[in-house]
Amino acid sequence: MKELQTVLKNHFAIEFADKNLLETAFTHTSYANEHRLLKISHNERLEFLGDAVLQLLISEYLYKKYPKKPEGDLSKLRAMIVREESLAGFARDCQFDQFIKLGKGEEKSGGRNRDTILGDAFEAFLGALLLDKDVAKVKEFIYQVMIPKVEAGEFEMITDYKTHLQELLQVNGDVAIRYQVISETGPAHDKVFDVEVLVEGKSIGQGQGRSKKLAEQEAAKNAVEKGLDSCI
């Protein structure tokens, strides 16, 4: 953890008073499970807390930044900023991927590169920072790490493919659009979902993701990229 502390101090002017709290933020459940006798804490509770403060601060930022955007647009933009892939990217930017404690099996299976694990660790770090410092320090960190990319327009370019597909298909009237899970693979804490999108019972696209919502977006994207002619 000393290397992590150095990174935090040199790049973000952050020094944790409670080093155990910082270590917990970077401890995956797989590591804690492999060391049960030591009663090591994992980062899921901190992730819960970090998710809440992240949602609050990003919501506040978007509310003030875009006074004319309707609630629906703000919600979509926030969802893109705090989604799994985005948070994993921020974690990599901060070099957090190097410091996550994983179980041997998780490490061997490529867990250090998984967006779910990286995104969760990023949120857990925010939760730990909130407890060790205060919400102002979390806000300072978010504005240093995340907001520059938001203001650069990186997340405006991401398309909500489910909404886009619905708009394309319903231009001439309502049609029945349904998403269904084809398969689920992987351990309970890191599942991969395969989803297909159906229009009037006909499969028009398939997608894969670490959550059902992400898989649905990928399926909708697949359908949009095929073109409407193949959808109806």
From Swiss-Prot:
One GO term of the biological process aspect: tRNA processing
UniProt keywords, alphabetically: Cytoplasm, Endonuclease, Hydrolase, Magnesium, Metal-binding, mRNA processing, Nuclease, RNA-binding, rRNA processing, rRNA-binding, tRNA processing
Q: What GO annotations for molecular function exist for this entry?
A: double-stranded RNA binding; metal ion binding; ribonuclease III activity; rRNA binding
Q: Which CDD domains match?
A: DSRM_RNAse_III_family, RIBOc
| Ranges for domain DRBM | 160-229
EC assignment: the record states 3.1.26.3
Please write the reaction equations for the catalytic activity of this protein. Endonucleolytic cleavage to 5'-phosphomonoester
Is Transmembrane there in the keyword field?
no
Q: Which InterPro entries match?
A: dsRBD_dom, RNase_III, RNase_III_dom, RNase_III_sf
Cellular location of this protein?
Cytoplasm
- Start and end of every RNase III domain? 5-134
User: Do you know which PROSITE patterns this protein is assigned to?
Assistant: DS_RBD, RNASE_3_1, RNASE_3_2
Q: Where does Mg(2+) bind?
A: E47, D120, E123
One GO cellular component this record assigns the protein to is: cytoplasm
**Active site (catalytic residues):** D51, E123
Q: Under which main EC class is this enzyme filed?
A: hydrolase
Which PANTHER family would you find in this protein's record?
Answer: RIBONUCLEASE 3, RIBONUCLEASE III
Name the protein family: Belongs to the ribonuclease III family.
Q: Which HAMAP family match?
A: RNase_III
Per the entry, what this protein does is: Digests double-stranded RNA. Involved in the processing of primary rRNA transcript to yield the immediate precursors to the large and small rRNAs (23S and 16S). Processes some mRNAs, and tRNAs when they are encoded in the rRNA operon. Processes pre-crRNA and tracrRNA of type II CRISPR loci if present in the organism.
Describe its partners and assembly state.
Answer: Homodimer.
Q: What is this protein called?
A: Ribonuclease 3
Q: Which species expresses this protein natively?
A: Streptococcus pneumoniae (strain Hungary19A-6)
Q: What is the lineage of its organism?
A: Bacteria, Bacillati, Bacillota, Bacilli, Lactobacillales
